[in-house]
From Swiss-Prot:
This is Neurotoxin PRTx26An0C3. GO terms for cellular component: extracellular region. Keywords: Calcium channel impairing toxin, Disulfide bond, Ion channel impairing toxin, Knottin, Neurotoxin, Secreted, Toxin, Voltage-gated calcium channel impairing toxin. Belongs to the neurotoxin 10 (Hwtx-1) family. 53 (PNTx27C4) subfamily. It is found in: Secreted. It comes from the Eukaryota. It comes from Phoneutria nigriventer (Brazilian armed spider).
Length: 36
């Protein structure tokens, strides 16, 4: 599974920001922004 680049938009499980999950900069928003 490829990880999305730092600060890019994470819009699917295949674009993980941390582990296998997208980490949100703002709670309950989707797509989320990568923080790592």
């Amino acid at each position: 599974i490829a990880c999305a680049p730092r600060f890019s938009i994470c819009n699917s499980d295949k674009e993980c920001c941390k582990g296998l999950r997208c980490q949100s900069r703002i709670a309950n928003m989707w797509p989320t922004f990568c923080l790592v």
